[in-house]
Structure formats: structure tokens, C-alpha cells
A protein has these predicted regions:
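Non-transmembrane, membrane-adjacent beta-strand/coil modules in membrane-associated proteins
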Residues: 23-27, 56-86, 161-189
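Long, low-complexity, charged/polar intrinsically disordered regions in eukaryotic proteins
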Residues: 156-219
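Phosphoinositide-dependent membrane-docking surfaces
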Residues: 39, 48-63, 143, 151-168
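Short amphipathic alpha-helical interaction segments
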Residues: 248-263, 269-271
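Short amphipathic alpha-helical interface segments
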Residues: 215-247
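Minor-groove-contacting beta-hairpin "wing" of winged helix-turn-helix DNA-binding domains
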Residues: 272-278
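Anionic N-terminal interaction surfaces
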Residues: 1-32, 44, 68, 77-135
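Short, amphipathic alpha-helical interaction segments positioned at domain boundaries
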Residues: 281-293
Length: 293
């Protein structure tokens, strides 16, 4: 295969077509091959799905009656020739599905044309930034946006919340994705309106998958006020700070709080000092949102 038909994913797994509650047949073994243009699942039959027909991607959500039959999964919704939507559930090892998910979203979303307004709002202030034409690029860590004036990115770890709004920007028709994210300690709003509704839905699903993963990792972490203060201090200073000064000069207390944050996986130490982990960044973002409300 050449060009867009070169394989970007190739693995052996299992699959089920249109799995539904009440159906408990064993999934079928298959080879899964994907290029930048199409997905092929080759088992007893060969299923070919053009990526331009993919309308939804769901990671890990399996109907209850077949849940015990699968491990790590990804479900792909796609339109058929008669206009109906079918689903294809693919199973593989956890690492394999994680890599496949990342490549799939890149193939589906890279090069997406969109109108963007960035930033549309900083804190409570509406900006006068113009709406620009842009192209999107995707990695598991961020959404990259390229305009005629330059490039910027929205890191997943900076996301506070996002929602679909049913109006367009820059004279275009809706809908639009409104993304609230942290920038320099302030809650910022950016508006992204892909020219294709299908791409907008997939972009929303991508954010839901990646941001949801981080939210689940911090959902059960309980923090006291001293821990929150130190996390914000690390964020604000990049870790270059006398931590005892944050907690009324109590060195022993500061050490205990730092150790607690480290054990909870919210900070890490490297050659350049203390820094936030992705999970720590999410916790700080939520606090920034609370302050800006």
C-alpha cells in the first residue's frame, strides 16, 4: 500500500458487529488493519469501513450482557450505504487498544477545517479577537490549531470543561464547541467550529475520552486546603518557590504536605524541581475555575 493506504495500525484482536444487550455470542477473532482512509476487519468475513463514514468512537463502554466477554475495547459507529448507523466493537490488549485509539482519532481529525475564536473570553472579559480559519491536529495530549497568523494548542491537562453550543461563529452555521481551559492562571474560553458536523461530534468525543480519563484518575482524591494551596503555588511558580512560605513558615508541615501530594500522584520531582503531574494539573484547573466563577 502507498500514501494514504499505508497501514498505520495492524493487530490481531476480536470483534463483534452491532453488539446489543441480550446477545452473548462469543466475539470473533480477526485481523484489524487501518490506513488513513479506511478500516478493515478481516475475520470469517471482511468488513471495510471508510473513515469518512465514521460518526462516533466510544472507548470501553460495552453492553452489560456482553461485558464479561471483552477486555479493552473501542466501539466505532459508522454510516452504511443505506444511511443507517452500525457499530463495530473491537477488542485487544489494553496497550494495543490505547495506541489504536490515539491513531484512530488522529486519522479522523487531523486536517479538520474549522473556524476558531481564541481566546473568546479571558476570566470574565470578552476579547476582541477575530474569528480565524484554521486546521486542527490531534495528539492524545492536545488539540493543535494552525491559522494564517500562527499556531497554538489546547492541552488536555488544561481543559476545565467543554460543551456544544448550537450557534456558529464568524458568519458560519453552528454548532460550535466551547472549551474552557486554564491559561496563565486564568479561566479562558476558546470557540472551535469545525466546518463538518461529523468532525465536531468526533472532536467532542475525543475530548470526552481523553479529559474523562484524567477526571477519573483524580475523582477519588481527597485534598485538604494546605494541599490545594501548595498545588496552586507549584502551578503559579513552576515549582521555584520556598514552600514553607506558603504554609506560614512551618517547614515540617510543608514537607508533610509535599509528601502527601507526591504519594497521591499530583506532583513529581525532576532535575528542574517540583512540577505538577497531568492529574495535578487537572486538580489545579478545577480550582482556577472555582476562583473565576
Amino acid at each position: 500500500m502507498k500514501g494514504d493506504e499505508s497501514a498505520v495500525a495492524d493487530f490481531t484482536g476480536r470483534f463483534a458487529r452491532n453488539p446489543k444487550s441480550g446477545i452473548s455470542d462469543e466475539p470473533e477473532s480477526a485481523r484489524v488493519v487501518m490506513s488513513k482512509r479506511r478500516l478493515v476487519v478481516a475475520g470469517e468475513e471482511r468488513i471495510t469501513v471508510p473513515l469518512s463514514d465514521v460518526v462516533d468512537v466510544i472507548v470501553g463502554n460495552v453492553p452489560p450482557d456482553v461485558r464479561d466477554l471483552f477486555d479493552a475495547t473501542i466501539t466505532i459507529g459508522h454510516r452504511t450505504d443505506d444511511g443507517t448507523v452500525e457499530t463495530l466493537l473491537i477488542e485487544g490488549g489494553e496497550e494495543t487498544i490505547s495506541k489504536f485509539q490515539a491513531v484512530l482519532f488522529k486519522c479522523l481529525l487531523n486536517g479538520t477545517k474549522a473556524r476558531v475564536k481564541h481566546p473568546a473570553r479571558v476570566g470574565g472579559r470578552v476579547t476582541d479577537e477575530p474569528v480565524r480559519n484554521a486546521k486542527l491536529s490531534i495528539t492524545p495530549e492536545r488539540v493543535g490549531i494552525t491559522t494564517a497568523d500562527g499556531k497554538f494548542a489546547i492541552d488536555i491537562t488544561d481543559v476545565i470543561a467543554f460543551e456544544r453550543i448550537d450557534r456558529g461563529i464568524g458568519g458560519g452555521e453552528g454548532p460550535t464547541l466551547l472549551v474552557r481551559h486554564a491559561t496563565g492562571g486564568q479561566a479562558t474560553v476558546s470557540l472551535v467550529s469545525p466546518l463538518s458536523n461529523r468532525r465536531l461530534n468526533l472532536l467532542g468525543r475525543f475530548l470526552r475520552v481523553e479529559y474523562g480519563k484524567l477526571l477519573r484518575e483524580v475523582a477519588d482524591i481527597d485534598l485538604g486546603e494546605p494541599e490545594k494551596q501548595l498545588l496552586v503555588a507549584v502551578y503559579a511558580t513552576g515549582g521555584d518557590i520556598d514552600f514553607t512560605g506558603v504554609l506560614d513558615g512551618d517547614a515540617a508541615r510543608a514537607t508533610n504536605v509535599l509528601n502527601s501530594l507526591r504519594e497521591k500522584g499530583l506532583i513529581e520531582e525532576g532535575a528542574s524541581g517540583v512540577s505538577l503531574t497531568p492529574q495535578g494539573q487537572v486538580v489545579v484547573n478545577q480550582r482556577i475555575e472555582d476562583v473565576n466563577i
